[in-house]
Swiss-Prot record:
Source organism of this protein record: Staphylococcus aureus (strain COL)
Highest taxon above the source species: Bacteria
Reported function: Thiol-specific peroxidase that catalyzes the reduction of hydrogen peroxide and organic hydroperoxides to water and alcohols, respectively. Plays a role in cell protection against oxidative stress by detoxifying peroxides.
PANTHER family membership: THIOL PEROXIDASE
InterPro entries, sorted: Redoxin, Thioredoxin-like_sf, Thioredoxin_domain, TPX, Tpx_CS, Tpx_Peroxidase_subfamily
Catalysed reaction, written as an equation: a hydroperoxide + [thioredoxin]-dithiol = an alcohol + [thioredoxin]-disulfide + H2O
PROSITE patterns, sorted: THIOREDOXIN_2 (PS51352), TPX (PS01265)
The name this protein goes by in its record: Thiol peroxidase
Its EC number(s): 1.11.1.24
Family assignment from sequence similarity: Belongs to the peroxiredoxin family. Tpx subfamily.
GO MF, one example: thioredoxin peroxidase activity
Active site: 60
Amino acid sequence: MTEITFKGGPIHLKGQQINEGDFAPDFTVLDNDLNQVTLADYAGKKKLISVVPSIDTGVCDQQTRKFNSDASKEEGIVLTISADLPFAQKRWCASAGLDNVITLSDHRDLSFGENYGVVMEELRLLARAVFVLDADNKVVYKEIVSEGTDFPDFDAALAAYKNI
């Protein structure tokens, strides 16, 4: 998919598209304390990567809470990645009262977005998406939501995560 809609308008996605069965490419993002983080930092663990346009919106907030509460019951790790500033992500985590949420910022280089094909070119934000990776970083599930203001398929993503 190289085009989605956002609030009904067409948006072009840029970056390298990856598919189920591919090995996930590396990326460099920032944590809430401005430390660089890469995919290799989570080696040997299955991962649910929840991608949101902005943590401060209602749909993104609910998506982050849902994956955090449901997927965190499983062994593995849940990452939420957006192009928000790390400070905004840290503030959101504090105001949401969620201590164990891992939010990562792709604002600086859009490394994650470019490597996973989810940069909304017109907005310089990340498209809503979910990637599930096994412990060897093989993509076992991928969804790029066709309308950026809709929720992802929680059931399908969580089933893929639980069945690894």
